[in-house]
Amino acid sequence: GCFQMIRFASRRMMKQRYGRIINVSSVSGVAGNAGQANYCASKAGMIGLTKSAAKELASRGITCNAIAPGFVKTEMTDVLSDEVKENAKKQIPLGRFAEPEDIANAAVFLASDKAAYITGQVLLVDGGMVM
């Protein structure tokens, strides 16, 4: 998964002395969630991997960051009941789920030269749900 991809991609990036690695974790990896210990642990592990890779690869011109989305309008959230969706939205200061484009825009930013001095960070894209 994530570890193998970093290993594979970083080899070429090291030769170029430039690269951007962007992992997609979850707010659950930051804050946890009752009943989802396995999912939360895997996403928290990805955050730890991101930070370690950032430290290992920075001297070679490679940044490594993670995006941690909250609720996003996808097939995964479409199956939730209206009651669950409304309760979730009450926990989000912006009062809505993210659009997939909101997550994509965060990735585009982290991949850009405007994020050249950002590494080892977790960018929460969650409408303020975790702060």
Where are these predicted regions, by residue range?
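Short, flexible catalytic-loop segment of classical short-chain dehydrogenase/reductase
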Residues: 47, 68-78
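The catalytic Tyr-X3-Lys active-site helix of short-chain dehydrogenase/reductase
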Residues: 1, 32, 37-45
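Active-site loop immediately N-terminal to the catalytic Tyr-X3-Lys motif
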Residues: 31-37, 59-60, 95, 113
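Alpha-helical segment proximal to the catalytic Tyr-Lys
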Residues: 11, 55-59, 116
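Short C-terminal tail/terminal secondary-structure segment
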Residues: 31-34, 108, 119-131
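C-terminal helical subdomain
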Residues: 66, 89-114, 118, 127
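Active-site helix of classical SDR
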Residues: 6, 42, 50
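Residue(s) in the substrate-gating loop at a strand-loop-helix junction
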Residues: 26
